[in-house]
Amino acid sequence: MESAKLTVPHTVTALCDALRTGGFEAYLVGGCVRDLLIGREPKDWDITTNAKPEQIQALFKETFYENDFGTVGVVTESDDPRFKVVEVTPYRIEGKYSDARRPDEVKFSDNLDDDLKRRDFTINAIAYEPESGALVDRHGGKEDIKRRVIATVGNPGERFNEDALRMLRAVRISAELDFAIEAETSAGIVASAKQLEKISRERVRDELVRILMSPRPMQALYVAQKLGILRYVIPELEDAIGVDQNQAHSYDVFEHLLRSLQHAADKDWSLEIRLAALLHDIGKPAARHWSDEKKDWTFHGHEVVGARMAKKILHDLRISSEMSATIVSLIRWHMFFSDPDEVTLSAVRRIITNVGVDHIKELLNLRICDRIGTGRPKEQPFRLRKYMSMVDEAMRDPISVAMLKIGGSQIIRLGEEAGPRIGWILHALLEEVLDDSKKNTEEYLESRTRDLMKLENEKLQTLGEQGKNRREKEDEEAVQELRKKHHVS
């Protein structure tokens, strides 16, 4: 038996100590051991033991047990959310999987080896005892980590027929770790791909989301397509393979979508942007027409077709209605910034209304992904920087009398008659506030208004015009500052 010295948090070792003190074995197992051996920080910590669920619960003050697999959630006193709940599971033997989703029955075992041989991949079938440093590796997982390969424990066909989601999980882990899928395991995926139809869309969605949020989603989806399982995740993507585009693009629609997605991942952008990037041109195959006049392919209206298709795809994947609405909106309007003749400040204000203030920057980021996905080298050419400046300009709060903590109706209540003098007073007040923002209080402005109300029309108009000119000057300076920020004139 090998040994190793791996760094394990005290909260986790304390749970193992409690199990051993109670007379039971306790090993870390699965992804946390794999990650420790690789040098990654584990996101989850799993303990396996020969104690039964009721024995585990008897050892710890606060637990919950709400599943058919024996897994007990142990609530710790740690403030760190990573260790707040640690799962402790008895060694187990699983019976037949008649539905390719879950075992027909689960039996608990007293033997660690029984538990390790039921696991999915060799790199996840290594157990580690923190106290002694013992490393139990019966299936060559440590060697596969060195080789950077993903291989099933035992026969691939049997493992995938037990739980077909393991095929998608292999692709996901390959993207997270940048490991290759071993040849026999790959062949097993090809042979068993159709079994994915039996998996609930919620479970498929969860694995897909983890793929999309990994550092290498483009690589993962390429592998999924080559192994024949992409069609059981988002079949519409396969329709984009080999669909040539116009001369502005270097790649077919499929590769363009994957490259757009990868840029979103490289930028560590949100799931919404990643899904929008993956699906933004999904309508192109259906909208493609040859133009004799242009001697090129056209895709008029593909954003409308794509938005409809994306809505259906996202519903099928059980994506939340709120997130789906955001993604569909981004896809529907993603062509807005592609036509410089249409992009006026008023048009930008309208598009902000269409996609929402909270999502306009996401639309710009999607445009960046779209551009990078064409194979063009520049991420932010002058035109895109100009659009960003226009968005900032359209969204900023204008310098105006609306900034004041007093309005025309209040001035009338103070005794001034409705008419042009109201505007002069407001602009005179604005100039003072622009000089000293501390004066923008209701108390000060009411007091100052009473003074201004005593002035003759000519003097008050002069002060008002000065304030108005000052507002226009400051407003223009603010706009120029925004343009300077984005390096546009």
Question: Each predicted region: which residue ranges?
Answer:
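Catalytic cores of the polymerase beta-like nucleotidyltransferase superfamily
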Residues: 1-489
